């Protein structure tokens, strides 16, 4: 089992140039749990994850890992505890799958330490877990988008960190591989106690797989808590500007969001939030 770590953001303000993206945000990540961050496009989700992983320094406030500011922690030392799979990563030209996944072991290498049997085992386990072992000798350049994404996830797993941050890990994946990846993260959490923080666009997947949801709107936390507490019709309207219905997923028992558009509604009238009536058109 991994060591439990506290990861928090305290009054964090982030931005690019003259633009502020996250403003005075406070966040506590439950240790040993799976947290999903959701929100509309450009609300600050990915920016927050970049700051939590030391890639973007706050203008004010701090991101703390076990009470120490991550931006004051040496990069290699931090990488032994906290791993990141960024959005749309780029691989060096011509690198093979095995070599890329092996780079996940670099934080564990030192001036005097050499590649070990444990490193081989960590890479093999990561390849098997992501169903990419058969691709080990192929160039990453040759792979499909879905295959590449699974290889990047394998590299993150090979790093064997106690805290794992993932920015849209199901990007480019078909629905079956989306489920496989999310199941894999749950297995990692349950078997190793890994703290997982992931940005997801699919609200229903987030509610099904996360223990803790964080909904961000306009650079601040709008709501946080259990999926049942956060995924409400009021939150969906406030965060996404979308009318919806929330029902219980009959397979998982978690909240299931049904979006209400202007078309393809049932012929009978459906009450909309605020007492308005909606019909098919």
List PLM regions with ranges:
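The feature captures the beta-strand-to-loop junction immediately N-terminal to the Walker
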Residues: 38-40
């Amino acid at each position: 089992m991994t060591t439990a770590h506290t990861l928090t953001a305290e009054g964090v303000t982030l931005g690019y140039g003259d633009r502020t993206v996250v403003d005075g945000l406070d966040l506590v990540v439950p240790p040993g749990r799976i947290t999903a961050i959701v929100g509309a496009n450009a609300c600050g989700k990915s920016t927050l994850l970049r700051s939590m992983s030391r890639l973007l320094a706050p203008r004010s406030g701090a991101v703390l890992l076990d009470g120490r500011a991550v931006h004051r922690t040496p990069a290699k030392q931090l990488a032994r505890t906290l791993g990141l799979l960024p959005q749309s990563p780029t691989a060096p030209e011509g690198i093979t799958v095995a070599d890329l996944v092996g780079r996940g072991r670099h934080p564990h290498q030192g001036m005097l330490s050499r590649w070990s049997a444990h490193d081989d085992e960590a890479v093999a386990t990561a390849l098997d877990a992501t169903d990419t072992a058969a691709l080990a000798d192929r160039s990453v350049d040759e792979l499909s988008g879905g295959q590449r994404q699974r290889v990047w996830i394998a590299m993150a797993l090979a790093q064997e960190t106690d805290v794992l941050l993932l920015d849209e890990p199901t990007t480019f994946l078909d629905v079956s591989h989306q489920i496989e990846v999310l199941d894999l993260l749950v297995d990692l959490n349950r078997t190793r106690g890994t703290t997982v923080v992931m940005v997801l666009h699919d609200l229903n997947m987030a509610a099904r797989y996360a223990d803790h949801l964080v909904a961000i709107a306009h650079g601040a936390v709008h709501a946080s808590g259990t999926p049942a507490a956060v995924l409400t019709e009021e939150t969906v309207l406030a965060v996404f500007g979308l009318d919806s219905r929330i029902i219980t997923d009959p397979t998982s028992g978690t909240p299931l969001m049904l979006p209400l558009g202007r078309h393809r509604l049932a012929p009978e009238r459906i009450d909309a939030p605020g007492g308005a009536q909606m019909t098919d058109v």
